[in-house]
Regions:
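Transmembrane helix-loop-helix hairpins at membrane boundaries of multipass inner-membrane proteins
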Residues: 1-74, 151-155, 419-504, 575, ...
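Aromatic-capped, Gly/Pro-kinked transmembrane alpha-helices
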Residues: 397, 420-424, 854-893, 901-1004
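Hydrophobic transmembrane alpha-helices and their helix-loop junctions in integral membrane proteins
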Residues: 55-64, 68-71, 79-91, 105-348, ...
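Alpha-helical transmembrane segments and their helix-start/interface "positive-inside/aromatic belt" motifs
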Residues: 1-2, 118-128, 321-324, 398-404, ...
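Hydrophobic alpha-helical membrane-insertion segments
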Residues: 2-13, 128-135, 331-334, 406-414, ...
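Alpha-helical transmembrane segments and their membrane-interface junctions
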Residues: 332-350, 408-422, 762-779, 841-862, ...
Length: 1004
């Protein structure tokens, strides 16, 4: 505790502007004394390492109390790490490395288990070889410079040269890199992480590695000619370690792969920042990554020690334990570089600096490695969320204190990192604050929490929307007002739904903030909060853990494309302002492609849509309505933003827009075709949502005034009819207990209001007059014909016809036909589910009769980006292809339907009507034994399979499954070197040194 207090006091004093402290021993100046420096960076590392050491000691306290020698060794290890960080003498650095290695070796095997003794033996072999290299290199450097003081060596660096100087530097570099466990010379480290006690493994991961990393930082100026090699070693280690992590199921070994990968990323970062002279960003980037890794990784090691389950598949034992899951989730989220933790701000700054130096290959490596790490970490988290047959784990509350403190410090560090990055935290952190407050109230009744959630979102929306204008205001209203309207439906469930309302508040507030952001950093922060909260909300659904993981991985892939696009925009303009993207010059096509691809993936565009049906189907029914009606609009807003800032101002030409248009129409077509053959009601609606978003994407791609008006008009309509359909589905499933349409039928008698809402939404969605969907399709077809996109217009027409087929199926199989016996007594959907449907239905009817109420504001909103106007003749919208008079169409269609209806009603007064009974059906063979056998809904469109079935074979699913399989196969081949044999590991260490030597110009 004293070490932490002293280090912390010194750090805050230095951060406040105090001068660095120079410590000299023996009463003389260096190089004749041991010289220690306690500057700002040293104090940060010492404070962080000692804090981790204190928490690790608390975690390991029973063993430390049992054996005084263990406590002594633990303190010696900590002091050795502190010495590595503070010393300014090369030989004393060697001494401190040796002290740390010996103490660590003793702690690894102190419990006397066979696996620990074997791991300790491998550890001492590896570190002995490394320190031997270090000592030899130190001797050669002393021979050439005549000093061991690091500062003096830097001043005399010109004296280091020739074969002796080269071998000296390579020996020194190889020693430090081996201590940091580079691939492939790191098998010994993985065995240590797996076998060592959790507290000791955590300190090796975050403490010893931090000390060696700081030692590398101190002597890095000596390696100016080797910086590329250092970056390559770090990059390969980061990428390969995370790739192999995909195959890992042992918890501590998995954490070992992650630790090695994170240190590899830090090595890469140090080398590249030094090579391209970016010292100003060391504090945010390197400091953020170190603190993030130190706290998150240590917290996970300690949590693993508390849970005491070796296989990730057994972690379902903590399902339902909210505090344990919260700590687990915070550490995982931080480790993967998601907001609001320090790793997010550090990776953001790192990617931007790499883009400034046009290091696009390194950007790809960092982002791919980060995606791989997220895959295996969140797979582990998914096991913890899945309630299985595993015996529940009892986790004493006090044992959670060390990882809980780590989680709290991570959150605080994230706040200060945001301030250091120049962000105004209050507005951006609003979703986090709201989620935290609601989490503290999570024990309250569910409906009361729903009320608090709605109030918080309403307050946040009111504070943001008033400042918005134009297109941003339209999306702000959809996301805030629409989100609140659909969220009213959450009242239909009376259970507590722990975790649901805090996450929903975070999601909706992040969506509310999104249209009001001004910089790419603010946009990306809100985007990632939206991604994370929506993922966690999906996991709360039935059997949703696996679909949620697929959703998260595609969402992160989408986010990384967006991040890369923003980074290149910053590199081209020198600004993070979104409005400056149009001035990116020759980089505009690349930025457009990256951002557009990111938003298309998030929208479930063709080829990237495989996450969509599973996520929509397995999420809670009321949340699926929010996911489709509201969350999907974020990607549309992103596309509009890209088109506004790049597609018009930068005049990128037709080609990128035309490609985007084809993507949109392929999405619409294949979404419709795949919906045709679905038996699951929610899955059908999921594919339908995908298809309808395709029309909107195509509208944005048109880059014309009429096209954008059509896209935004369809966006509003998509919110309305998808909100109705998914909420209606929630009510149907709530009453029937099934998703499968062939297990329904005849529900018009039980749920007439739901039937009316669904029927009207289907008419609107299908583009059939007189409702608003017809106007949207009319606008889109006109815009396509104006643009000369005749083939795309034809495909749009075909897709609309297919959409009517599958939507007709919902009416026919769910509401019409014969009713199941068990459904005779079903009631109408809960009233609170019907309220938002009625409101949205009223809006559809209003827009169908008076579309100008919406079209004029839309036209005015897009005019600054795509100049033009809509031509009205009274209430008729006129184009050179014709006109659309919505009120007249409503009157005509109403009359067409009203006249036959009145006639039939009059005829019924004089006719004897006999309702068709369930078994009043002619069969060619035997009479069916059960009512279920009379239902024709199963495989309703089977007769179309022979004609178009080949189009909907799951080729995209097969492709992405193959990508996953190839990744696992490659990972398996990369880890064959980890045999567990100490001699093999020693050989790989020597081979690594030889490779490093020859790669940097060494000769025999």
């Amino acid at each position: 505790t004293g070490m932490v207090v002293i280090a912390g006091t010194g750090f805050f004093a230095l951060a406040g502007g105090a001068p660095a402290i120079e410590i000299q021993t023996a009463g003389v100046a260096p190089p004749f004394s041991i010289n220690l420096r306690f500057g700002l960076y040293e104090s940060l590392f010492v404070f962080a390492v000692n804090l981790a050491g204190l928490l690790a000691a608390v975690h390991y306290l029973p063993r430390l109390r049992e054996h005084a020698a263990t406590m002594l060794l633990f303190i010696i290890m900590l002091m050795g790490i502190d010495g590595m960080i503070m010393t300014r003498d090369l030989f004393n650095l060697f001494i401190f490395i040796e002290i740390t290695s010996l103490a660590t070796y003793s702690l690894i095997g102190f419990e006397g288990r066979e696996t620990q003794l074997a791991a300790g033996f491998k550890y001492i072999i590896a570190t002995s070889v490394a320190t031997t290299f270090f000592l030899l290199g130190t001797a050669f450097i002393y021979y050439q410079t005549g000093t061991l003081n690091i500062d003096d060596i830097m001043a005399r660096q010109a004296l280091i040269g020739g074969p002796v100087g080269q071998i000296a530097l390579i020996l020194l570099l190889a020693s430090l890199l081996i201590e940091l466990k580079p691939y492939p010379a790191n098998g010994w480290g993985l065995d240590v992480y797996e076998a060592a006690p959790g507290a000791i493994a955590s300190m090796i991961s975050v403490g010893v590695s931090a000390g060696v990393l700081f030692a590398l930082y101190k002597v890095l100026p000596l390696f100016g000619d080797f910086l590329t090699s250092i970056a390559v070693v770090g990059g390969i280690t980061f990428l390969v370690s995370n790739l192999i992590g995909l195959k890992q199921k042992n918890v501590k070994r998995l954490l070992g792969y992650s630790s090695i990968g994170q240190i590899g990323l830090l090595v890469l970062t140090l080398a590249l920042l030094h090579k391209y002279d970016q010292p100003a960003h060391l504090a945010l980037i390197v400091g953020g990554l170190v603190i993030n890794h130190l706290l998150a990784k240590a917290g996970l090691f300690w949590l693993a020690g508390v849970v005491k389950l070796d296989n990730i598949g057994e972690w379902s034992g903590i399902a339902g334990k909210s505090l344990t899951l919260l700590i687990f989730g915070i550490c995982l989220v931080a480790l993967t570089g998601l907001p609001p933790f320090p790793g997010f701000w550090a990776k953001w700054a790192l990617i931007l600096e790499l883009a400034v130096d046009e290091l696009y290959g390194w950007i790809a490596l960092v982002l791919v490695g980060s995606l791989l790490e997220a895959a295996y970490l969140f797979r582990w988290f998914g096991h913890a969320l899945r309630r299985g047959d595993t015996t529940p784990v009892t986790v004493p509350g006090m044992d959670l204190m060390p990882p809980a403190i780590a989680a709290v410090v991570l959150a605080v560090a994230g706040y200060f990192s945001a301030m250091h990055a120049g962000v105004v935290p209050m507005q951006l952190f609003l979703p986090v604050y709201a989620a935290f407050v609601l989490y503290l109230l999570d024990g309250l009744p569910g409906r009361f929490k729903s009320l608090l959630m709605i109030a918080s979102v309403a307050a946040g929306g009111a504070s943001v929307i008033g400042e918005l204008q134009g297109v941003n205001r339209i999306f702000g209203i959809i996301m805030a007002g629409g989100g609140l309207l659909v969220a009213i439906a959450t009242f239909y469930r009376s259970d507590t739904r722990k975790g649901f309302y805090p996450l929903l508040a975070a999601l909706l507030l992040s969506l509310v903030i999104l249209p009001g952001v001004r910089t790419s950093l603010e946009f990306f922060f809100s985007w990632e909060i939206m991604t994370l909260s929506s993922y966690l909300l999906i996991t709360l659904g039935r059997d949703a853990v696996r679909p949620a993981l697929v959703y998260l991985l595609f969402s992160l892939g989408s986010a990384f494309f967006i991040l890369a696009g923003f980074a290149i925009g910053y590199a081209s303009t020198g600004s993070v302002e979104l409005a400056s993207l149009g001035g990116a010059g020759d980089a505009v096509p690349l930025i457009f492609t990256l951002l557009g691809l990111g938003f298309v993936i998030k929208a479930g565009g063709f080829g990237f849509h495989i996450w969509l049906p599973g996520a929509y189907t397995e999420a809670d029914d009321d949340f699926t309505a929010i996911l489709s009606a509201v969350v999907s609009k974020a990607s549309i807003f992103g596309l509009v933003m890209v088109a506004a800032y790049l597609g018009v101002q930068a005049d990128i030409g037709l080609d990128p827009a035309y490609v985007l248009g084809w993507i949109g129409m392929l999405t619409a077509t294949f979404g419709a075709l795949m919906a045709v053959f679905q038996e699951d009601l929610k899955r059908l609606l999921a594919y339908s949502s995908m298809g309808q978003l395709g029309y909107i994407i195509a509208g944005v791609a048109l880059m014309s005034h009429l096209g954008w008006v059509a896209a935004l008009y369809l966006t509003v309509n998509h919110f309305l009819y998808k909100g109705i359909l998914f909420l209606a589905a929630a009510g149907i499933i709530y009453r029937t207990g099934t998703h499968l349409m062939y297990r329904m039928g005849g529900l018009i008698r039980n749920m007439p209001l739901t039937f009316v809402a669904v029927m009207m939404a289907i008419i609107a969605m299908s583009g059939v007059p007189p409702l608003s969907g017809f106007g949207g399709k009319w606008l889109l077809f006109n815009a396509m014909m104006d643009k000369g996109w005749y083939w795309l217009a034809a495909i749009a027409f075909f897709s609309s016809a297919v959409a009517f087929l599958y939507m007709f199926r919902i009416l026919q199989t769910v509401f019409l036909g014969q009713r199941k016996l068990e459904h005779r007594d079903l009631r109408e959907a809960p009233a609170i589910l019907l309220v938002p449907q009625v409101v949205m239905l009223g809006m559809i009817m209003l827009l169908s009769a008076y579309p100008r109420l919406l079209l004029d504001p839309l036209s005015a909103a897009v005019a600054p980006y795509v100049p033009g106007t809509l031509h009205w003749d009274g209430w008729a919208l006129v184009s050179h292809l014709g006109y659309w008079n919505a009120p007249l169409i409503m009157i005509i269609v109403g009359a067409v339907w009203a006249v036959p209806l009145v006639f039939l009603l009059l005829m019924s007064l004089s006719m004897k009507i006999q309702p068709v009974k369930q078994f009043n059906i002619v069969y060619a063979a035997e009479r069916p034994d059960r009512p279920e056998d009379t239902h024709y809904a199963y495989r309703f469109f089977a007769h179309y399979e022979r004609a178009i079935g080949f189009l909907v074979k799951p080729r995209a699913t097969a492709f992405w499954s193959a990508v996953g399989e190839w990744s696992h196969t490659l990972a398996a081949s990369m880890r064959v070197i980890y045999t567990g044999n100490g001699q093999t590991y020693a050989f790989l260490i020597l081979a690594f040194f030889v490779a490093l030597y020859f790669a940097n110009g060494g000769t025999v």
